[in-house]
Amino acid sequence: LVGSEMCIRDRTAAAQAQRDTLTFNNDYYFSKRNVEELVPVTGQNIVMLGNSLTERGFWAEYFQGKRVLNRGIGGDCISGMINRVQPIVDGRPKAIFIMGGANDLLFSKISNEKLLQQYERLLDIIARGTPRTRVYIQSLLPLNEAHNEAFMKGKNARFAEFNALLRAMAERRGLTFIDIWSAMQRNGELPEEYTFDGIHLKAAGYAVWI
């Protein structure tokens, strides 16, 4: 998830010609990866892996003394996380909290089933490389579709369907599923007081998350 409401409007037209799957390879992605790797992950760390919803959170401040590293990159998708997870795995952190898939479902035509396969690949890399790391699967968050009905209409239904797949996958793998969706949603939508643009969170939204 990237930027402001203006950015979302700019991308609405592009949604008419969406790709089958999403990749995220631009200067911002690569510069963020480069800067993040200046601070290597260690066995004492808890890692927050995700997109802009994760990136915008002040996790180290929220959980002082827990050695939390923010590895969110705005705009990132599951394939992008696959491409950058190895340095995290190599550090064998205590725990990894994953929030991903929203950009894939918003900005590509990928099916829920194919996206789940990508998610499984991400988890396989983590499980093989650092089997003792605790992995937490966080649900997708609801949207406030009224902010951009032309672009977001019907997306909450897809998000809810994908969350059900994530929950089942977590149970099958013996991982913890964190249902943030249910804590935040009101009548299936992200409440206005939690969001600036229908996607990204205000402080009140992060207060619910943590």
Model-derived segments and spans:
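Surface-exposed cleft-lining segments at the edges of enzyme active sites
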Residues: 70-73, 102-115, 149-155
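Cell-envelope and extracellular/periplasmic
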Residues: 72-76, 97-108, 140, 185
